[in-house]
Amino acid sequence: AILQSYALQKKLREIGTQPEIIDYRCDYISNPFRLVNLKKKGLFNYIYGAIGHICYIPRRFKCNKFRKHMRYSQPVTQGKMQPVAGKYDIYIAGSDQIWDYKLTNFDTTYFLDFVKEGKKKCSYAASIGENLPPEEYQQKYKKLLSDFDEILVREDYGADIVENLTQKRP
């Protein structure tokens, strides 16, 4: 995700814009070992995630060094997005599986739900996961995705899912 963010930010600078990455801190992802997550993930996934998190520490250190070459907003968290809600002309959500309800605990911030009306909302190489979301999420997905001005997804099956939900082909 960091390399894709860097490349997109670099390209946007080349065309004369001043892009800034919103330094969003998703609690479910940033604090995976909270006990409330044990219930949601199950014991096996919780332990597996803990091992993966430990193995990821050296990589995260390298990523943090790389981040120094990128322009970020002040850190923000869910429910406290006001500092960035109307700051930009265009908002771009993208990379990784930002729309996979299992990985983000269906954090709607990744759908740019905090953006003030009248601002453009786009996605770039977004991924939704491999399957159509369960029935209980589909209306929410439809509403959130329908608010986007442009949607670009990474995979063909992601385009199929978005089309199934919104009747618009990315």
Task: Label each PLM-derived region with a short phrase.
Residues 4, 8-143, 163:
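Aromatic- and Gly/Pro-rich donor/ligand-binding loops
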Residues 6, 155-156:
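Alpha-helix N-cap/helix-start capping motif
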Residues 16, 132, 149, 169-170:
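Secondary-structure boundary/capping signal
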Residues 98, 157-158:
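Alpha-helix capping/helix-boundary segments
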Residues 148-155:
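A short beta-strand/loop micro-motif in the catalytic core of glycosyltransferases
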Residues 159-170:
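Helix-loop-beta element that forms the nucleotide-linked donor phosphate-binding surface
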